[in-house]
A protein has these predicted regions:
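Conserved helicase ATPase motor motifs in RecA-like P-loop NTPase domains
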Residues: 19-20, 142-158, 166
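Conserved helix-turn-beta segment of the N-terminal RecA-like "Helicase ATP-binding" lobe
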Residues: 51-75, 171
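Walker B catalytic acidic pair
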Residues: 119-120
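A conserved SF2-helicase RecA2
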Residues: 393-453
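Conserved helicase motor
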Residues: 50, 71-79, 93-99, 125-130, ...
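Inter-lobe coupling linker of SF2 helicases/translocases
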Residues: 91-97, 104-105, 109-110, 129-144, ...
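Conserved Helicase C-terminal RecA-like lobe
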Residues: 8-12, 19-22, 26-48, 224-249, ...
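SF2 helicase motor core recognition
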Residues: 98-101, 156-158, 326-332, 351-355, ...
Length: 453
């Protein structure tokens, strides 16, 4: 009720609430109240694809069954677009935004004032992305009721906040121009190395600017969640692999019997080193028509460690996060079977089926890419063990996947997280970066919570 009332009082708000604190339910309660006050009002909800087709429909059926909705996704979205006038809620995945934008430009979608909800608003944190720029052009379509929702609003620091708040107030609080915002609050350098660091004392100015429309609810005050137990498993590279890893790091290349792998930049090198640690590296060749990517397999160290952890789990379901597709093939070879996997190329219907089976306890090992499962998916009833075969650079993806298990509805008394890391390598660097980013985001949470929001 606190979040619902905050929306009704302020109109445009940011629900900066921990995953599982009921953001979706609060928004639906607010929509029901506003529908009574403003008959005919419609709401557009933008969300990641899986929450669009699973979470929002389930939550509407549970908490607001009188609200009629449609989902503009899939092959029939053009037809359903013409039938939206009678719907209370129109749900659109971010992946369909370009299509929706073109429909609006062509006036094939009714142009009027809609309440708008940005679910997982950190997906519009980049001020220069095509997604954000399209939203900026569509802002005149949206009423004064605008809601941003995120449990991970600033995964890369406070600089991530500008475009999310711009969608709410057209630049009133954090300036109407990103360059002005960056110059006012941050030190910015580049090229060749681009760095953005907060100016001394600027954090408090940002916190004060956004405080009045931000609702921050700390999980400790509202939820009795199981603790997260973290175990880091450090692997030492054997001498030959250590020699090859160091050579790749120093020389930006690595030789194989049939090819030579090159890293053209520091960023490319970082990616090649991370591939190496996961068991293989990609090389690219041009066959005259297109670029072909070839996988060169190196080792199975992490897959073998996962096998050991599965034995320790003693039959309890395990959720395992990977970063590269070749990891799945290595895992299948080591485990001697093909566990279900959800990543970019997995059809949504298959992914939904796997998640349902997981929640019923029918899948002993589910392999996922955090970008495919992390946002707004309910899989907490299926298990309490998470293994990171590879950590992502993104704090958002990292925390979102963790919060799929550490949330309301988790049946176990604790969630166990294993991180498989290779010592004295990029793995350790990534873990340190995630820790620093988390500290910055936690400072934001603490400041807003202490302010009473």
């Amino acid at each position: 009720e606190k979040a619902r009332d905050f929306i009704l009082k302020n109109g445009s708000v940011f629900l900066m609430m921990y995953c599982g604190l009921g953001k979706t339910r609060s928004v639906l309660m607010a929509i029901e109240n506003l529908k009574k006050k403003y008959p005919g009002m419609q709401t557009i909800i933008f969300a990641p694809v899986y929450p669009c087709i699973t979470t929002w429909p389930d939550e509407i059926a549970k908490w607001a069954p009188d609200l009629e909705y449609t989902i503009l996704h899939g092959a029939s979205k053009d037809h359903r677009c013409s039938l939206t006038n009678t719907k209370d809620i129109i749900i659109i995945p971010y992946s369909s935004l370009k299509w929706f934008y073109n429909m609006c430009v062509a006036k094939k979608f009714p142009i009027k004032k809609y309440m708008v909800v940005f679910d997982e608003s950190s997906m519009i944190k980049s001020p220069t992305s095509k997604r954000t720029l399209m939203f900026m052009e569509m802002l005149p379509m949206f009423s004064d009721f605008r809601v941003a929702m995120s449990g991970t609003p600033a995964p890369n620091g406070l600089v991530d906040l500008w475009s999310q708040y711009y969608m709410l107030d057209n630049g009133k609080r954090l300036t109407a121009n990103f360059a002005w915002f960056r110059n006012k609050y941050f030190n910015y350098t580049g090229p060749p190395r681009f760095e953005t660091t907060i100016k001394s004392g600027a954090e408090d100015h940002v916190y004060t600017a956004i405080d009045d429309i931000t609702l921050r609810m700390a999980k400790e005050d509202y939820l009795d969640l199981p603790p997260l137990i973290n175990n880091d498993w450090l692997i030492e590279l054997p001498a030959k692999l250590r020699k090859d890893y160091d050579y790749l790091e120093e020389q930006f290349c690595l030789e194989f019997p049939t090819a030579e792998v090159f890293a053209a930049s520091a960023a490319a090198l970082s990616n090649k080193l991370r591939q190496f640690l996961q068991g293989a590296v990609y090389s690219e060749t041009f066959d005259g028509e297109r670029v072909k990517r070839v996988v060169h397999y190196i080792h199975k160290l992490k897959a073998q460690m996962l096998k050991n952890l599965l034995e320790q789990a003693n039959g309890h379901p395990v959720l395992c996060a990977i970063q590269f597709k070749f990891e799945y093939k290595i895992l299948c070879e080591v485990l001697k079977y093909k566990p279900p996997v959800i990543y970019g190329s997995t059809p949504p219907t298959h992914a939904q089926s796997y998640m349902r089976q997981w929640n019923r306890g029918q899948i002993p090992l589910l392999i996922v890419h955090p970008a495919s499962v992390g946002h707004g998916v309910n899989i907490q009833t299926g298990g309490n063990i998470l293994v990171w075969l590879a950590l992502p650079w993104s704090l958002e993806l990292y925390q979102q996947l963790i919060h799929r298990l550490v949330r309301q509805g988790q049946l176990a008394d604790r969630v166990i997280m294993h991180r498989i890391l290779i010592d004295r390598t990029k793995d350790i660097d990534v873990a340190a970066v995630l820790s620093r980013k988390d500290a910055t985001q936690q400072d934001l949470y603490n400041a807003l919570t202490k302010g009473g929001k």
